[in-house]
């Protein structure tokens, strides 16, 4: 049913309690409540914002990021690898979670990324072939025009799932020439099907945009929750924050998750679960809740004044995040980008009218062009050799690794090293962005990343660069025993020098694309990095990167499979407790992670149903 009052919620005899009604949590809620005899409860700290134009419209993210009504608005500790800056760490605070505030990019990783979870890290049962049916089950691909430069195959896409995917209706005029310039500079063929597990090359990307009528965001609320909110066995409590998991001891001394304690409207309540508690609070708050409940590194717990119930030094460690930098050029006269709307009120009015009349124009969706290249193809053999030597011998990360499982970290490093020497590996992502990409202001406030061109410049276009397989590792840990206190978030940005090498190589390549003769007459001059910075000097390129990155908002790994949870996503050393969200992903992937999180949650729902004896419904959904 729709969201309920707290008294109704706490008096319900739930079978499953899902902590967090975000990207993964609402998938689980919808799938588990398919069993009519099962009571499912969802606890969400934010509000239901169904029909909110800030959420629905493609231009909405800039209005939501940093707004506490939509965003947890976390901040990292100062980052030593990025000139001691403290970074804005946005996380969706609403039903739908970050699927409701992100930029709607729908990517799938390379098949190798997922296969490495099993083959390199020993997480059995999680391979590309086993996860692909769940990518398809979550997706509703809308018809793609043949001219869209995004080849799709029905074999790898779903057309009846909850989440709509489509090509945005607007493309910046420069992008056809830019796509050709990418092809020329990279000397790569365009991918035959970029969602099949092989996405090297450049193409127009899908987005979670529902274009069946007015183009609106398709996210966990609209796709998974809204169609089933009338179910009597599904209850959602909004504006309630879980404080800790309630644990009891079985006769063998192993703790059992009995329910949770929550805070709502100034009061605390306990609510129980007869079968399982499932954490879907995300990569920041799932490990925080484990630690608040006494599950984690004993030294961390002791420092926060929390009694240790289950010792696991991996809880909250292994944090991995993509970082982004960018090259921006000023467009030539007559070449429009989204920046043009900031400079010309009449043009803005024209595009507002286009959106109102037929849902077209620059306000209907602005980012479409992207691609992936290997690191080895952008660097000399000498540079690649030097990078390889630094992977396993980097003093700047030795302190971080000492508190984590050394063997586990070594296997991750070996996997990255193998990819970076592979000429078919999608090591670096490039995103065509029809606006000035302001890393100088965006690190402290993500809402300012695309807020118009700098003074003295007309409309700009940017190529955003991201390292897909970072070696830097960070952590999320409680500071105190108070659940209302934000945890200490240390992403470890650029703490490994190889990450700087990779981003610098990407910046140099992006600049080369802009200088292609195919863009003559379309771009005028470089805005960032400044014209005086010599990108032929890799030391200068590295220095630029260290001062000009922002997070991509793809944090994962803090409750990793194999370390904190097992292959069925059960928390080690505890009964009736699972984690299902991005935190269980053991290693970073070459994609925005939303599609993978949907797939993981879909698969988790089948695992849980099978474990609980509900197997009769499984085959109907694959």
UniProtKB/Swiss-Prot annotation:
Gene3D superfamilies: FAD/NAD(P)-binding domain (3.50.50.60), Glucose Oxidase, domain 3 (3.30.560.10). The active site is at residue 554. It comes from the Eukaryota. Pathway: Mycotoxin biosynthesis. Non-reducing polyketide synthase; part of the gene cluster that mediates the biosynthesis of the mycotoxin citrinin, a hepato-nephrotoxic compound to humans due to inhibition of respiration complex III. The pathway begins with the synthesis of a keto-aldehyde intermediate by the citrinin PKS (pksCT also named citS) from successive condensations of 4 malonyl-CoA units, presumably with a simple acetyl-CoA starter unit. Release of the keto-aldehyde intermediate is consistent with the presence of the C-terminal reductive release domain. It comes from Monascus ruber. Keywords: FAD, Flavoprotein, Oxidoreductase. PROSITE patterns: GMC_OXRED_1, GMC_OXRED_2. This is Dehydrogenase citC. Its cofactor is FAD. The gene is citC. InterPro entries: FAD/NAD-bd_sf, GMC_OxRdtase, GMC_OxRdtase_N, GMC_OxRtase_C. Belongs to the GMC oxidoreductase family. One of its GO terms (molecular function) is flavin adenine dinucleotide binding.
């Amino acid at each position: 049913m729709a969201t309920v009052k707290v008294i109704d919620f706490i008096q319900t005899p739930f079978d499953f309690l899902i902590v967090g009604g975000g990207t993964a949590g609402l998938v689980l809620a919808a799938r588990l409540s398919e069993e009519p005899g099962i009571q499912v409860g969802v606890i969400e700290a934010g509000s239901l914002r169904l029909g909110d134009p800030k959420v629905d419209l493609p231009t909405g993210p800039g209005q939501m990021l940093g707004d506490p009504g939509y965003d947890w608005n976390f901040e990292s500790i100062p980052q030593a690898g990025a000139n001691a800056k403290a970074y804005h760490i946005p996380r969706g605070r609403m039903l739908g979670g970050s699927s409701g505030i992100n930029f709607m990019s729908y990517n799938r990783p390379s098949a190798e990324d997922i296969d490495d979870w099993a083959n390199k890290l020993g997480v059995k049962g999680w391979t590309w072939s086993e996860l692909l049916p769940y990518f398809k089950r979550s997706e509703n691909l809308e018809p793609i025009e043949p001219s869209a430069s995004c080849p799709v195959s029905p074999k790898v896409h779903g057309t009846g799932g909850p989440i709509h995917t489509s090509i945005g209706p607007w493309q910046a005029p420069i992008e056809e020439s830019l796509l050709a310039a990418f092809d020329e500079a990279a000397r790569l063929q365009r991918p035959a099907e970029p969602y099949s597990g092989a996405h090297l090359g450049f193409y127009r990307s899908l987005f979670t945009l529902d274009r069946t009528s007015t183009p609106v965001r398709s996210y966990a609320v609209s796709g998974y929750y809204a169609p089933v909110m009338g179910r009597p066995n599904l209850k959602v409590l909004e504006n309630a924050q879980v404080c800790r998991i309630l644990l009891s001891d079985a006769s063998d001394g192993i703790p059992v998750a009995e329910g949770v304690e929550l805070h709502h409207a100034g009061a605390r309540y306990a609510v129980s679960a007869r079968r399982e508690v499932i954490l879907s609070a995300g990569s920041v708050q799932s490990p925080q809740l484990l630690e608040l409940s006494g599950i984690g590194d004993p030294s961390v717990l002791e420092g926060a004044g929390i009694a240790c119930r289950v010792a696991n030094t991996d809880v909250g460690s292994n944090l991995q995040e993509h970082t982004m930098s960018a090259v921006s050029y000023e467009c030539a006269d007559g070449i429009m980008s989204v920046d043009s709307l900031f400079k010309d009120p009449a043009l803005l009015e024209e595009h507002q009218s286009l959106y109102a009349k037929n849902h077209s124009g620059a306000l209907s969706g602005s980012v479409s062009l992207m691609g992936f290249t290997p690191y080895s193809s952008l660097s000399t053999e000498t540079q690649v050799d030097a990078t390889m030597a630094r992977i396993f011998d980097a003093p700047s990360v030795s302190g971080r690794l000492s508190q984590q499982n050394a063997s586990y970290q070594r296997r991750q490093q070996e996997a990255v090293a193998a990819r970076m020497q592979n000429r078919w590996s999608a090591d670096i992502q490039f995103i065509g962005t029809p606006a000035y990409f302001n890393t100088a202001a965006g690190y402290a406030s993500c809402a300012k990343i695309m807020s118009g061109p700098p003074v003295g410049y007309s409309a700009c276009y940017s190529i955003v660069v991201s390292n897909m397989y970072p070696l830097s590792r960070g952590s999320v840990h409680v500071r105190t025993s108070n659940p209302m206190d934000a945890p200490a978030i240390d992403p470890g940005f650029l703490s490994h020098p190889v990450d700087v090498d990779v981003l610098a190589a990407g910046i140099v390549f992006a600049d080369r694309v802009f200088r292609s003769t195919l863009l003559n007459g379309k771009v005028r001059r470089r805005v960032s990095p400044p014209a005086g910075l010599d990108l032929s000097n890799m030391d200068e390129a590295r220095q630029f990167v260290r001062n000009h990155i922002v997070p991509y908002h793809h944090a994962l790994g803090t409750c990793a499979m194999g370390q904190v949870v097992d292959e069925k996503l059960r928390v080690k050393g505890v009964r009736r407790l699972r984690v299902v969200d991005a935190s269980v992903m053991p290693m970073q992937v070459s994609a925005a992670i939303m599609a993978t999180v949907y797939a993981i949650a879909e698969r988790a729902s089948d695992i849980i149903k099978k474990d609980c004896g509900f197997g009769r419904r499984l085959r109907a959904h694959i």
